Amino acid sequence: MDARHAATVRLETIVSLAKRRGFVYPGSEIYGGLANTWDFGPLGAELKRNLKNAWWEYFIQRREDMVGLDGGILLHPRVWEASGHVEEFNDPLIDCRRCKSRFRADTLIEERLHRSTEGLSLDEMTRLVQEANLACPVCGVRDWTPVRKFNLMFRTFIGPVETESTPVYLRPETAQAIFVNFKNVVQTSRVKIPFGIGQIGKAFRNEITPGNFIFRLLEFEQMEIEYFIRPEMWEEYFDHWLNEMGQFLRWIGFKPDRLRTREHGPQELSHYSRKTVDFEYFFPFGWKELCGLAYRTDYDLRRHQEYSGEDLTYFDQERNERYIPHVIEPTMGVERLFLALLCDAYDEEPAVDVNGNPYTRVVLRFHPRVAPYKVAVLPLLRKPELVTVAREVAQELRQYFRIEYDETQSIGRRYRRQDEIGTPYCVTIDYQTLEDRTVTIRDRDTMQQVRVPISGLVEEIEARLRSA
C-alpha cells in the first residue's frame, strides 16, 4: 500500500486519536454537540499555540519589513459593503423539499456527477441537478428547490433592539481590519513600501461544511499578511511570497511530496483577486487547499477610500509620487494546518515490547518546533526515591521547555503514550540516576537512548532542538 492510498483510509483514525489524546473534542459534547463546532483540548491548545508562534516568528519577527496588528472582530457594516462581502461573499445552496436538508450545489454536482462547476451560473447548476435527476443524499427523494445565493456572513446586532438598520457582522476574514488601519500604521510605524502587516485572529463563516473533521469550520483562526507594494512590482513579490510560504511549510515539518501548488482558473478567482495560487495538501480525503496566496491589486484600499471618503494613498518619497499601493496576501488557516500536521505526522510501524510481544507502534512525528510537549520526564518506577529526583528534574526543565511529567503505568506504556502525542524526547530517571546523577534521553523517532548528566541536561535538549 503506497503512502497516498494509506492516507485515504485513516481520517477516522486521526479523529479517534485527536479525541482520545486530548487534541480536539466535539463542541458542546455534554449537550449532544453542535454541528461543525469543535473545542481544542490540552494538547490541541499547545499545538495551536506552537503553530501560531512559529508563523509569527517566521513571517513577522524575523523580517524588518513586517509589523503586527490585532484588529477587532466587529467592524463598521460599511466595511463589508466596501470590501464586496455583502454582495459577493456567497455560496450556491440547494434544498431538498422533502426532508429540508440543505447542500452546497457546487459540491453536490462535483461529487455526484464528477464534473467541475467552474463558471456555471445558478440557473445552469439548477438545470444540471434536474437533468441528472439527482437524489437527495439524505432521503433519496428527487425534489429540489432552485439553486440560490446564500451569504456566508454571520449577522448580529448592537444595542438592545434588533432592527435591520443596526446589523453588524462577525468578520469572515481578518484582512479588512488591516486595510482600514493602513493609514494609521503608515502614520505611526515609519514603514516604507514595500512592507507588510500581519495578524492572527478569529473569523466566522456560515458555511455548509462537508464533515471532514476540522477541515472547514464555522469559527476558525486565520494567519494573514497584507503586503503593500508598488503596482509594477507585483509579479516579483508574488513569486517571493510563494517561495516564503513553501519554505515555512517545510520549516514546520511538512513532507514535500504531500504538497503541491495550483493556480486558480479565471472563474474561480475571488472578486478581489487578479491571481491566486493555493498550496494543496494530500489529505485523507484527497488533494485540498491548505493555504493560499492572492494578488488583491489595489481593490481593497481603493474601495475603502471610495466608501469612507478618506485618502488612503501612499506618498512614495523615493519616487516623489502618490499612489494607492497594491497588495499581495499570503493567508493560512490555523485549524487546517493543524489537521494537515496531524495527518502528516501520523505514522505506524511494527514493534516488539520488552516481553517480546509484537505490537503496532503509533507515532506522531511532529517537528519539535510545533510538538505540544518538547520533553516528558518519567521516573522508571513510582518509588519515592525516584519520584523525588524526577520532580526536581521536571521543575528545572519547566524553566526552559514545555514539558509533561508522568509517573502512571509501566515505563513502556508511558513511552508509547508520548510517542502517540508526538513528544520528541523522554527523560527517564532510574536507579543509576541515584548513583551517578545521570538520566537517559530517549529519542522518539529512533527510540535510541543515551545517558546524560543532569547538570548538562538542559544544554543537551537545547542542542537537539536547535539541530532538528
Swiss-Prot record:
InterPro entries: aa-tRNA-synt_IIb, aa-tRNA-synth_II, aa-tRNA-synth_II/BPL/LPL, Anticodon-bd, Anticodon-bd_dom_sf, Gly-tRNA_synthase/POLG2, Gly_tRNA_ligase_bac, GlyRS-like_core. Substrate binds at R104, E173, F220, E221, Q222, M223, E224, E329, P330, T331, M332, G333. One of its GO terms (molecular function) is ATP binding. SUPFAM superfamilies: Class II aaRS ABD-related (SSF52954), Class II aaRS and biotin synthetases (SSF55681). Keywords: Aminoacyl-tRNA synthetase, ATP-binding, Cytoplasm, Ligase, Nucleotide-binding, Protein biosynthesis. It comes from the Bacteria. It catalyses: tRNA(Gly) + glycine + ATP = glycyl-tRNA(Gly) + AMP + diphosphate. Its EC number is 6.1.1.14. Its main location: cytoplasm. Belongs to the class-II aminoacyl-tRNA synthetase family. This is Glycine--tRNA ligase. It comes from Thermomicrobium roseum (strain ATCC 27502 / DSM 5159 / P-2).
